[in-house]
Amino acid sequence: MKFRLILISLVVFFLILSVNDFQIYAESKTSSNKRFIDNKDGTISDSKTGLMWIKNDSFLHSGHWINWSEAKAYINDLNKTGYANYFDWKLPTTRELKTLYDAEKINSSQVGREMKIHIDPLFGKNGSGSLWSMNGNGRHNAFGVVFNTGDVFSANKYSRSRKATRGVRIFSYNK
C-alpha cells in the first residue's frame, strides 16, 4: 500500500512538472505592439514584414567586430550549421535593416559607448549599433544602417570599426 502511494505521488509529480515545462516552452514572448515574436530558438519573427531575424547580432555571437567580407562569411557559417534548423540565411538589404529601426524604442546602448540602439527590446542587448547590409557601394565600400539614427552609412568594406551584421530570412508560419 505504501509503495503504491509513493508510485502514484511520483506519477502526479512528473505530470505536473511536464505540464509546467510545456507551458513555459509554448509561451513565446512578443513585443509590446505584438509585431515581433521571440521564437525561443535564437530567432525573432517580424509579423509586419514577414522576415525572420537572428536575435543576437554577430558581435554578440562572436565578441568581435567584423568587416563586410567577414559579414558574408558569418552568414555562410549560419547556413552551413543550419542555425535554428534553417539553411537560407542571408545578409539583409539596407531596406530590410531599416525596418528594424524604431525611434520610439530603446533596446540598449552599444557596447562601450553611450549610443542608444533603437530596435525592439526583444533583440539581444548591448550589441552593435551599426550593421552591415548586403548592398555594396562601388568597389571599396558597402552600405549598412546605424541604429541610433536609422541612417544608412557607407564604409570601407575592410572597416571593422564597431560593425556587425544580423542574419535574416523570409519566414512562413508553416515552419
Task: Map each language-model feature to its residues.
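Bacterial N-terminal signal peptides
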Residues: 9-18
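An exposed tryptophan-centered "aromatic clamp" motif
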Residues: 72-88, 94-144
